[in-house]
Amino acid sequence: AVSSPGELLAEFQEAHPVWARWIAGLLMLFTGMSVGRLTVRYNLYSDGTCLAIPLYGAIACGLAVGGDYLTAFAASALLALATKNFCRSYCNGFGFDAIFRASLYIGLLPLVATAAAPLLVLLPLAVMLFRRTLREVTVAVAGLLLPVLTLCYVNWGAGGGFLAPVAE
């Protein structure tokens, strides 16, 4: 049977704790800079400030206290990437690439951190909020289902049941 990405990250953290801390630190820096860039680019504050970077750092210190810090930082990086791509898809023309990537990251979230499964509700809300066409909705649903279907296919190719990773 094939392990989920969250299980693989937990195994990596257990086997290589020093490398896991380094990777978690890099993920924390990447996510903090991404969140800071989002706030400046889309003018979420009245003046051009990078206040979101230290705010994310303070929140990330709380994430690092738990035992599965690598999966928590990977999930927060995926959420930041999904938010960035949802913001990019808000345009006058078609945003197939951005909405596909955003839904792909949202689809990966429950595989990395199962506590993020309720965030799957974000996709229909984002599609309705951004008033996307039916073609873009189809692309978004395909991006959402692609990680789960890929994991099921790889598990089936390894000799397990096709729906075994979803049933767990």
What residues fall within each predicted segment?
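TM-lumen/periplasm interface segments of multi-pass membrane proteins
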Residues: 1-29, 33, 38-41
